[in-house]
From Swiss-Prot:
Reaction equations catalysed: (6R)-5,10-methylene-5,6,7,8-tetrahydrofolate + NADP(+) = (6R)-5,10-methenyltetrahydrofolate + NADPH; (6R)-5,10-methenyltetrahydrofolate + H2O = (6R)-10-formyltetrahydrofolate + H(+)
Pathway field: One-carbon metabolism; tetrahydrofolate interconversion
Protein species of origin: Flavobacterium johnsoniae (strain ATCC 17061 / DSM 2064 / JCM 8514 / BCRC 14874 / CCUG 350202 / NBRC 14942 / NCIMB 11054 / UW101)
Assembly mode: Homodimer.
Protein name stated in the entry: Bifunctional protein FolD
Cellular component annotations (GO), alphabetically ordered: cytosol
Amino acid sequence: MQLLDGKKTSNDIKNEIAAEVQSIKAAGGKVPHLAAVLVGNNGASLTYVGSKVKSCQEIGFDSTLVSLPETITEDELLAKIKELNEDDNLDGYIVQLPLPKHIDEQKILLAIDPDKDVDGFHPTNFGRMALEMESFIPATPFGIMELLERYKVETAGKHTVVIGRSHIVGRPMSILMSRKGNPGDSTVTLTHSRTKDLAEFTKNADIIITALGVPEFLKADMVKEGVTVIDVGITRVEDASNAKGYVIKGDVDFEGVSKKASFITPVPGGVGPMTIAMLLKNTLLARKMRSAKNK
């Protein structure tokens, strides 16, 4: 069994990007600039945005945190989005989800300039991804593809079962794994919470990518020998013996499944760290695209 180490791989990627930023600086170019829009003060969102800003600083990007009150109206937020779209100093930005209930998330995501949509959620980028054109790929699926590539996991002709159909992970993964190339060229089954007899699918899978958010539901008797398992699930489970009062669990019963797997991601330290690294990679791509356009 080989561990797909997202922590180490994400650090490698950050170092590669940092070296490229140094080259851009040395040539007198403009370094990438990423902004994060945070509405309200949701604890998890604050932590996540904070780690994105910190990562930007570590690799030499410019970064801006746009902090807005929970009470902001939809129209005011749309006006801010328009402002960011028109800001020539900015290469890409993300709007941290979830947004307050009185704001229509779809309307906000649609208002983002696709050329600055480094989260890859705009329908234009999603469509370009499906058509195998250059696009911003959502950071978590992008990170999974990068792990598979760097660890040389064979995907061509393999049966991949994706569990979960969200537009953030499941659906893009089903598209990416079936695209031409490596990783890719896989036969994909997309399953979800309404799928009957899920184990019948997982038992026949060469690769399982699970993003359901149900702690440790994937057991050893649901997988075959030699399977590759990518665990995207992150759930806080109460644990009085832990100083924090909780532990982070993935969708996979790691202890049991790892004994049968050829490759497996841990939780934490697997897919999670890759997400921020690939957001930075998308931002670097946005800078290059803008530089090419301005020549």
